[in-house]
Amino acid sequence: MTNIRKTHPLIKIVNHSFIDLPTPSNISAWWNFGSLLGLCLVTQILTGLFLAMHYTSDTTTAFSSVTHICRDVNYGWLIRYLHANGASMFFICLYLHVGRGLYYGSYTYFETWNIGVILLFTVMATAFMGYVLPWGQMSFWGATVITNLLSAIPYIGTNLVEWIWGGLSVDKATLTRFFAFHFILPFIVAALAMIHLLFLHETGSNNPSGLISDSDKIPFHPYFTIKDILGVLLLILTLMILVLFSPDLLGDPDNYTPANPLNTPPHIKPEWYFLFAYAILRSIPNKLGGVLALVFSILILMLFPILHTSKQRGMMFRPLSQCLFWILAADLLTLTWIGGQPVEHPFIIIGQMASILYFTIILIVLPLISLLENKLLKW
């Protein structure tokens, strides 16, 4: 009798994806983030579902409903903070996952990489809409400022913004539609993640050396299921420490003040995981230019397969490129810091320099250094 795992049409798919999947034997802990992102997504969908049972998407009651969840619902405070801080963990894992892809040249799998970039955009859109829902000051003004950026689009901009708002300002219609989209998008993310995996399993995983690993593959289970469990435990530990000891550490105090269209907060800023893009947006004095820079700061990831000039795949044996990669990482941390600072000297000039450096490294320096490394290796 054959094993049901290998014959049943449904179980067979799971088997080929998570059990008998041939996996390079030398993949490091940097390859754990895919499974961690899956865990984050499931956590966010489940906690979000329970929050949606008690939340009301009406401008008069939204803020009160969140307070009600925290005060009156059994473990409502836990569900709410798991959801809010779970988003932060999601983005930490996302950025590390993308960073791994850049470092080890995983972007040479075009379809997997491009679906991944689309996934990143979708998750960012979901997180932005979710931030609007508690209807605090930063929710309202964040929604107003970010949606208003679309008015920079020539000719149709203003009409587009009013169409998204459902009126002449961010109001009840906006909140209702954002709640609807925030509810549906995670399921679209889940579907895209499946397509992401589908394309990945067509080619097989990359590995730290960047070499073809067909001759040295081992089954995913039990080796990497056990390895992934370590990452899962560390993620849960970090999330629970954050939720139970300092749940508001990554939030904004302004969001504990109900939304007031007549009172603008002194410093409007998004959640910490968008600050690097926000800093790039602010560093360009022109509105349309800023919006384009904001979009291209993420869209530029799609250019990596085209800009890859090295004869080697990953950066494991390329010390010059490694240096540049870590300068880029430090630059992104600098941009994140600048995004949270007020628009005044010296932060303006630091932000502008960091933005220029970001695009210069990716578009010019990294491809040239890769060519130089080819020369040094007489290739």
UniProtKB/Swiss-Prot annotation:
Membrane topology of the entry: Multi-pass membrane protein
Keyword Mitochondrion annotated: yes
Primary location class: mitochondrion
UniProt-recorded Gene Ontology molecular function terms: metal ion binding; ubiquinol-cytochrome-c reductase activity
Subcellular location as annotated: Mitochondrion inner membrane
Annotated residues for binding of a ubiquinone: H201
Other comments on record: Heme 1 (or BL or b562) is low-potential and absorbs at about 562 nm, and heme 2 (or BH or b566) is high-potential and absorbs at about 566 nm.
Pfam families (UniProt xref): Cytochrom_B_C, Cytochrome_B
GO cellular component: mitochondrial inner membrane; respiratory chain complex III
Function: Component of the ubiquinol-cytochrome c reductase complex (complex III or cytochrome b-c1 complex) that is part of the mitochondrial respiratory chain. The b-c1 complex mediates electron transfer from ubiquinol to cytochrome c. Contributes to the generation of a proton gradient across the mitochondrial membrane that is then used for ATP synthesis.
Transmembrane parts of this sequence: 33-53, 77-98, 113-133, 178-198, 226-246, 288-308, 320-340, 347-367
Cysteines engaged in disulfide bonds, as pairs: none
Complexes and interactors: The cytochrome bc1 complex contains 11 subunits: 3 respiratory subunits (MT-CYB, CYC1 and UQCRFS1), 2 core proteins (UQCRC1 and UQCRC2) and 6 low-molecular weight proteins (UQCRH/QCR6, UQCRB/QCR7, UQCRQ/QCR8, UQCR10/QCR9, UQCR11/QCR10 and a cleavage product of UQCRFS1). This cytochrome bc1 complex then forms a dimer.
Organism listed in the record: Petaurista xanthotis
Keywords: Electron transport, Heme, Iron, Membrane, Metal-binding, Mitochondrion, Mitochondrion inner membrane, Respiratory chain, Transmembrane, Transmembrane helix, Transport, Ubiquinone
UniProt similarity note: Belongs to the cytochrome b family.
Note describing how the cofactor binds: Binds 2 heme b groups non-covalently.
GO biological process, one term: mitochondrial electron transport, ubiquinol to cytochrome c
Record protein name field: Cytochrome b
Gene3D superfamilies, per the entry: Cytochrome Bc1 Complex, Chain C (1.20.810.10)
Sites where the protein binds heme b b562: H83, H182
